């Protein structure tokens, strides 16, 4: 009995210390308004650490002590995002921003106006934080938007991120999305410490933040001055959030999640432009690096009406600041050959620090761009990081041109294989005619073929492809599938286990889908979305290869240029040989599953809303099942809603559906309907 009372007393001490440390940590790291001296905070933390060391059975994942880091990891595991983490389209001037609003209004078919939620575009790393019953259970990087890395142990060390939400009334599951960044002051102090120890300094705060989040040892991450601001939500289960983007962030702030103090609700696009100008003027005085502002439609229901394109929401845009510029010398020009044979002039520059990185190369794109710039070897040029990412030559300082400046001469034969170079009428790009005979094209074509979005061959990276081509072990995509583990072991850093893993991965990749196969062929201008549209429209590879231009133009996302590229590709005998060889080595895919003509789907055209927590299905599985039955799944209840599927703890959406006399199913009713 005494032991039980003692255990209860210790648990109460731990709970009190954890609660006080969480409160004072929030006051210090988020509100910048400490209530107690640092020494008192440190004393409480030491007391907590001592108690937890004595009673490890009472350890809690949301304890403030978890911020100091744990046992180093061997590697990061992959995390599949339940909802994709999309990127944003960009605007670089007021005209492009006004065009963005016009697209919104045209799509909404309204002459009215749209209100916006605006925020600085932080130069950091996008992350997803998953809270279950108020406790942080997982943090993941954005990755490619569909799959990221599990960085939970590192994110737990970020003091401004609550390990447990404050207050009450939060959703059962809540995914918070935001930006991890390193404030300027912390970055400067980190680099000063590194230089003092003789270590290499980070180039910019973004690189420092990225390097910190990818530390396998979270104790190192815990020493880095990282911070976080939320900018949106992903998965929400168990209750409905506010119908305003801005108000949702205010809700998050009430639960202890940091919100950028510069976020504003604005009524008109002119207000947005004024906000952009104001933030731009104050950019250097802000505590963190930014490269523009993000503009989002504020009303969540309107966001859902606008929807998404392949990689970005239609309802948001990043308005970038003019890129930083510097002057440097153009020492030489080299010509690179790309996957489709495009020959690109690359300027070799005197290294210059611009926009946070050292730049020594910049693309000159093509002969038209060289002529437009009037640039010569030996010139002093102004270099800019377009969108603060891609180095670009924007002009020549002709007053500094030396007497020995040389004109840039384009090759008439390929610099790699010496095949003829041709420039098709109406195109700016010159191309090598060598095809797979050209090593450069062969390498790039094979790299594309095995890439994640194509055949997704694990263990077949760039260096492996380069060695296979350089050693003339593979000349066509089909040749990859004829490799044996014994042959592959001759490659650098390729032991028997790695070789067998590569061969097994190649064998597994033979089972693919028609959209992936079309994309893997590397047809110019045919991306993932176009490949999927072609597959869904024609259903078979034979129908695609035999299609006329008129038939191709009927396909969504296929215009004149793409149609011509498809026709030209499949008319080339050597391209059809590549396709037939791939089929011959066993590449295959399931038939496209489409409903029979004239067959009406059970929920065809019905507008369905999902709400509450589901126990038998995941939210994504339920949505996919409803869509397969013909339904249009939306996120908010309105007079247009035909059906509400309500799980446990359904909130205001259920109430609204009842008020509007909308048909309501529970989860079991949906499962039964699916199994009919």
From Swiss-Prot:
GO terms for cellular component: cytosol. Gene3D superfamilies: 5' to 3' exonuclease, C-terminal subdomain, 6.20.10.30, BRCT domain, DNA ligase/mRNA capping enzyme, Helix hairpin bin, Nucleic acid-binding proteins. The active site is at residue 121. Keywords: DNA damage, DNA repair, DNA replication, Ligase, Magnesium, Manganese, Metal-binding, NAD, Zinc. Its EC number is 6.5.1.2. Residues 598-676 form the BRCT domain. InterPro entries: BRCT_dom, BRCT_dom_sf, DisA/LigA_HHH, DNA_ligase, DNA_ligase_AS, DNA_ligase_CS, DNAligase_adenylation, DNAligase_N. Its cofactor is Mg(2+); Mn(2+). It catalyses: NAD(+) + (deoxyribonucleotide)n-3'-hydroxyl + 5'-phospho-(deoxyribonucleotide)m = (deoxyribonucleotide)n+m + AMP + beta-nicotinamide D-nucleotide. It comes from the Bacteria. One of its GO terms (molecular function) is metal ion binding. Belongs to the NAD-dependent DNA ligase family. LigA subfamily. This is DNA ligase. The gene is ligA.
